[in-house]
């Protein structure tokens, strides 16, 4: 199934609902960072959550950075997303594999930890970026994105995030949904949705059964879904050698000189995608001649 996100209004237009298939997105992250199962699930849910959140609160050229750190074994997680369906992300410790939890599922809560925060920084292109931060309430991440929306955006919501990792560490499926309660929603409609959410299978199980994002929304709202938009989603990094050269120019000149004299070159590695950029002595000398850093 191709990776794409669906935007809709649903339930007699009392809810705004989003669903995404993002298996390829998470598989690309797993390939680039060589994540093991628990880390794959944690990073994957973070990528899916950011895709859904960005599509629901951003527009135009706006961007966001989601940071999660629960002081668990995977360490900090950072994901960048935009309104156009593009994400990139990484975590500090990709080689984390843990015993399954009591439901025989990957223990994302243990991997992420619960002693920490989820923060979202929104850059609207004008003025200073705005950051909202909430304490982690679960570590499973779906509930944590839900709590963020309620606390920082004042939007009652439900978020479901799911990643299935195969025995060989490859990504089986990944996806999720986000439902926002609109002001005209009745108590009866909200109660009905809550009951549906309780009885609903995991998104990963639905996707393994061949269900599409549209099918998942239909299941939640008994087919009362009006699709407004569909867009492809992808893992994509905008790093470049030129951007790293600019970063080197901001370093103190003596540090760049040491790279020339002692290391005879430098290798820059992008945290987000793992791509490497080599700088020769001559290239570093050119950087030094244009350096903005102090001596």
UniProtKB/Swiss-Prot annotation:
GO terms for biological process: protein refolding. GO terms for cellular component: cytoplasm. The keyword Ligase does not apply. Keywords: Chaperone, Cytoplasm, Disulfide bond, Redox-active center, Zinc. Disulfide bonds join 237-239, 270-273. GO terms for molecular function: protein folding chaperone; unfolded protein binding. HAMAP family: HslO. Redox regulated molecular chaperone. Protects both thermally unfolding and oxidatively damaged proteins from irreversible aggregation. Plays an important role in the bacterial defense system toward oxidative stress. This is 33 kDa chaperonin. It comes from Lactiplantibacillus plantarum (strain ATCC BAA-793 / NCIMB 8826 / WCFS1). The lineage of its organism: Bacteria, Bacillati, Bacillota, Bacilli, Lactobacillales. The gene is hslO.
